Each structure stands twice: as C-alpha cells, then as structure tokens.
C-alpha cells in the first residue's frame, strides 16, 4: 500500500473524529471551508473547486492539502478552540498550506508525513494565538512561520528529505493568460495553468 493510500485511509478515519455531534456531511463541509479559506472563501463549494484545481496539477498535493486541513481542524477541536471558528474553516486553511508545502519542498515519506501532522497542528495553535490578540491579523502567518521552521530544521537535521530547487521557466512571462493563471495557482503552490 502506497504512502498516499495510507494517508487517505488515515484521513478517512480522522474525518470521523472531527468536531463531535456533527455528521459526515458537516465534517466534509468543514474541510471544504478550510480549503476555501485559503482564498478567504467561507464556502465549502469554493474549497472543493479549489481542491479540484489542485488535483489538476497533482493528486498527491491534493491529498496532502486535505491531510493538512483535517489535522489542523482536529487539533483545534482537541484544544477546544471556538466551535464556530472551527466550522468556518479558520483553523484548517493554514494546515492546507502546510500540507501542500510539505509536498512541494520535501520528499514524501513517513518523516515528511509526520512533519505535516506536527506542522498542521502547530499552525492551528499559532493561528489561535493570532486570533486572541487584535493588533495584527494572522491570515497565513501561521503557515509561513511553521513552514520556515520545518524547512530550517530539515536543512540542518535531515537535508536529504528536501527536494532540489527547480529553475524558473522564463517563457511563461511572455504569455499574459499563462502568467495570470500560474500566479493565481501559485497561491496554493500549483504550477499548472488549469489550477489557476
């Protein structure tokens, strides 16, 4: 069984434990809203459409995105954060981005999946810290801080897990539609025109 199949099975099992007293449909809506919140959309359908865009680029990144969303949401639920914020997907979207970043920057193996779980959970805690103060909005700062921490840690402790950097393709800048679509897709690390 591949790491992606195992991840999918774990996600399904974890999905059953999302905020208590809710059904499977509500749990799926929470996940959809969590993904949708990456683009400030408190709407499950928007999140599902964004997930389809990710799938157009990479089904593996889509699984990691859902995994990050589920872990971030479960962490918030276990830490008894505000239920309405959880239902709105406010603790899932940073996990979504952490999951995608793991797939973009790291080789997928048991260590990177463990880092995804740890990173998505910590991103919920950091998001909660931002929500408790009113001086500075958090937005994606929890994701950025957590991924920086993960990348720096891996760079010094386990550099073999990090993927090599890819060079840019200078031809894309000459085509407006391609560039526009690629830029929108890059919000979720998707390098595919259909994803944008």
Q: What are the residue ranges of the model-derived segments?
A:
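N-terminal signal-anchor module of multipass membrane proteins
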Residues: 2-81, 181-196
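C-terminal ends of transmembrane helices
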Residues: 72-84, 123-133
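Phenylalanine-focused residue identity feature
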Residues: 8, 17, 40, 93, ...
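Long hydrophobic alpha-helical segments that form multi-pass transmembrane helix bundles
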Residues: 13, 17, 141-195
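Membrane-interface helix-loop-helix junctions at boundaries between adjacent transmembrane segments
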Residues: 90, 95-166
């Amino acid at each position: 069984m591949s790491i992606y199949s195992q991840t999918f099975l774990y996600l399904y099992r974890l999905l059953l434990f999302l905020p208590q007293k809710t059904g499977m449909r509500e749990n799926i809506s929470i996940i959809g809203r969590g993904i949708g919140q990456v683009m400030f959309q408190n709407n499950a359908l928007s999140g599902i459409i964004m997930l389809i865009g990710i799938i157009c680029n990479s089904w593996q990144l889509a699984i990691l995105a859902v995994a990050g969303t589920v872990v971030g949401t479960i962490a918030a639920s276990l830490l008894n954060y505000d239920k309405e914020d959880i239902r709105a997907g406010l603790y899932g979207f940073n996990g979504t981005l952490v999951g995608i970043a793991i797939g973009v920057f790291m080789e997928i193996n048991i260590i990177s999946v463990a880092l995804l779980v740890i990173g998505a959970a910590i991103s919920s805690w950091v998001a909660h810290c931002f929500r408790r103060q009113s001086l500075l909005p958090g937005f994606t700062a929890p994701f950025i801080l957590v991924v920086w921490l993960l990348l720096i840690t891996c760079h010094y402790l386990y550099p073999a897990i990090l993927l090599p950097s890819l060079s840019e393709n200078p031809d894309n800048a000459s085509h407006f539609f391609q560039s526009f679509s690629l830029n929108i897709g890059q919000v979720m690390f998707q390098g595919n025109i259909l994803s944008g």
